[in-house]
Regions:
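Expand to "…catalyze enediolate/carbanion chemistry for C-C bond making/breaking, isomerization
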Residues: 1-210
Length: 210
């Protein structure tokens, strides 16, 4: 995956010339604000997936347009630059509505769940774990890493654990056995959204060969 310079920089045209390289799987476009720029990247790359990085007020305002842009696989949230552009002194609570809005835009555009921004604390694995689990609860599908040693924690937190898999299996089995009748698992009613969640967990577990 290659991150190019922003479309309004002097280096962007030269970056476009590199995008057809066969070793590039996808392209990250920072400071993404216009669907037209995303389309330019997509075409220059020979049709590779593009991940617009939302890092500004304008980019956030254009989130649905960017999510629908040609070649977009998923959005990503650059919350540090976003805070600077918004003159925010934000904690995670203040950023919550912006994160949820990106998840919603991704769903409305029928693209993959977005990728959350980095955790800058390099030596705090617990803070990283908290950040990743929050992102997963909100509906994000991944998280940017600022250092290679963060990858293990991020992958682990986005991977269904044994308890989740066992719960999902119980839900699917109970729903099948009920034959359309009301059923409960672990004392909680199982309805269509619960079944869909269980199916998603098992699909992810299968994709990760768990």
């Amino acid at each position: 995956m290659l991150r190019v310079n922003a479309a309004d920089t002097a280096w962007f045209p030269a970056d476009l010339e590199l995008l057809a390289h066969p070793g590039i799987a996808a392209v990250v476009l920072p400071k993404a604000e216009h669907a037209e720029d995303v389309a330019v990247v997509h075409r220059a790359s020979g049709g590779k997936p593009v991940l617009p990085l939302i890092e500004s007020a304008l980019g956030f305002e254009q989130r649905l347009s960017l999510a629908h842009a040609e070649g977009v696989q998923r959005l990503a949230f650059g919350h540090i630059d976003f805070q600077a552009d918004m003159n925010m002194r934000a904690t995670e609570d203040e950023l919550l509505p912006f994160r949820v809005a990106l998840v919603l835009a991704s769903r409305l555009a029928d693209i993959a769940p977005p990728i959350d921004g980095v955790t800058t604390a390099l030596d705090d694995a617990e803070l990283l774990r908290i950040d990743v689990l929050r992102a997963r609860r909100l509906g994000f599908g991944g998280k940017l890493c600022i250092h290679p040693r963060q990858v293990v924690v991020v992958n682990a937190c986005f991977t269904p654990d044994a308890d989740e898999i066992a719960w999902a299996q119980r839900v699917i089995a109970a729903d099948a056995a009920a034959g359309g009748a009301a059923v409960a698992v672990d004392g909680k009613m199982v309805d269509r959204p619960v079944v869909l969640r269980a199916q998603a967990i098992l699909a992810e577990a299968a994709a990760r060969k768990l």
